[in-house]
Amino acid sequence: MQHWTRNHTLDLTLCALCAAAIAVCSWITLPATIPFTLQSFAIFLILLLFEGKRATVSVTVYLLLGAVGLPVFAGMKGGIGVLSGPTGGFLIGFLVMALLDWSIGLICKKRSLVVKVVCLAAEQMVCYLFGSLWYWLYTGSGGLGTAFAVCVLPFLPVDFLKLLLATAIYHPIRKRISHI
């Protein structure tokens, strides 16, 4: 039996808080075909602050809470229907982003903030691809290009701003939590 330490408790607490932060950011919504939310902002910030396992566990917990029906997704929705619906690919894409970031972190132990931000932008592109493909397969309308135009192009400038904001507040937050 594993001995629980302060670090285990801290990890669990941080993962729970990060999952809650994603949920709260998902509730801040502007309705559209694919709703505009602050989820990606929370994901960006979590991936900057807590690389690897903590970030991946946080996103997984968020998705599991939503899958069992808690209203943690955009529009205060929950349930497996949201995950399997037209926007489910973007939600799963957040997990893919975290897994990619963890993998990159294992390969490149010391990444500068600039490298981290470039990695996040590339990981977001993978999320866009995953979500657009899912949306296209779900709706069956148009082609992948049409799905990309509907699901990604309107979000590029806003998501770029979210990434800049997450980067801007990274250092002050990192400084405050570095002692825990």
Model regions and ranges:
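Membrane-embedded alpha-helical hairpins and interfacial helices in multi-pass inner-membrane proteins
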Residues: 76, 109-180
